[in-house]
């Protein structure tokens, strides 16, 4: 069970809504993933009507919607988008994204922290997408963010946990949930994130662009479950030396 702010989730896999070939395929993949929290970019939906091609099937699926501010380049733009989302969707939950460079889509740490502090004061439940910076993540936690979402690698790159060393520090010091977001390309990456202590992962591109998104979503669901179970089971510690799993000489001594 994962708790963030006032909500609890059975699934530790969060999913996105971009890059799917159709809305129907998107919903089928989300259902197959078991995800209960789904992000959607405000710039991709028509907030004036609930029969929007993306919004309507998500509402029907009964998932918790996490609107994001993707496309915002400044704190002011993100705050404006957040208020539009709250008014249109009736939720104060928000994935805060501010990335001024469209080529790399890396989060702006200064603008993100500034927007996060303001939005928390305005009553939003803020989950900020941020760099894998332990100092920044701690500052975001201190201003009241409900979770932190450090990147594993650039958005959509499928490179995996390239920031692993920093993620480990973030996880170790965090007192709010840590959701590894961006760069997760295959199910084994998700399993590794849960094994190392992350509370959840957010996956979009790896599922949406797969040859079979529904089966890939199932694979991610199983990987997240396996990673979490492995961590909870207490894996053995690493060693530089070999340790025999059975006696090496007992049968020789017995027959001497």
Curated annotation (Swiss-Prot):
Matching entries from Gene3D superfamilies are given as: Aldolase class I
Designated name of the protein: Thiazole synthase
Compartments, record wording: Cytoplasm
HAMAP family of this UniProt entry? ThiG
- Please tell me whether the keyword Cytoplasm is annotated for this protein: yes
| Active-site residues, Swiss-Prot/TrEMBL | 95 (schiff-base intermediate with dxp)
Q: Which organism is it from?
A: Escherichia coli O139:H28 (strain E24377A / ETEC)
- InterPro entries hit by this protein: Aldolase_TIM, Thiazole_synthase_ThiG, ThiG
The record's gene field reads thiG
- Cross-referenced Pfam families, in alphabetical order? ThiG
């Amino acid at each position: 069970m994962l708790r963030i702010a006032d909500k609890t989730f059975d699934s530790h896999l969060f999913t996105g809504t971009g890059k799917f070939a159709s809305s129907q395929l998107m919903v089928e993949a989300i259902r197959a993933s078991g995800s209960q929290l789904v992000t959607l970019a405000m710039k991709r939906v028509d907030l004036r009507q609930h029969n929007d091609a993306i919004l309507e099937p998500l509402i029907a699926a009964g998932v918790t919607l996490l609107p994001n501010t993707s496309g915002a380049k400044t704190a002011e733009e993100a705050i404006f988008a957040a208020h539009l989302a709250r008014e249109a969707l009736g939720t104060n939950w928000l994935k805060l994204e501010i990335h001024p460079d469209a080529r790399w889509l890396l989060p702006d740490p200064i603008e993100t922290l500034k927007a996060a502090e303001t939005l928390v004061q305005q009553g939003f439940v803020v989950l900020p997408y941020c760099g894998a910076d332990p100092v920044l993540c701690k500052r975001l936690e201190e201003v009241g963010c409900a979770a932190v979402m450090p990147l594993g690698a650039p958005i959509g790159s499928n490179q995996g946990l390239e920031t692993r060393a920093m993620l480990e520090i973030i996880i170790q010091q965090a007192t709010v949930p840590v959701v590894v977001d961006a760069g997760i390309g295959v199910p084994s990456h998700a399993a590794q994130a849960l094994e190392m202590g992350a509370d959840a992962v957010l996956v979009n591109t790896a599922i949406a662009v797969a040859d079979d998104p529904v089966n890939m979503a199932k694979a991610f669901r199983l990987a997240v479950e396996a990673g979490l179970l492995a961590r909870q089971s207490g894996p053995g510690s690493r060693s530089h030396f070999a340790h025999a799993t059975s006696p090496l000489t007992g049968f020789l001594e017995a027959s001497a």
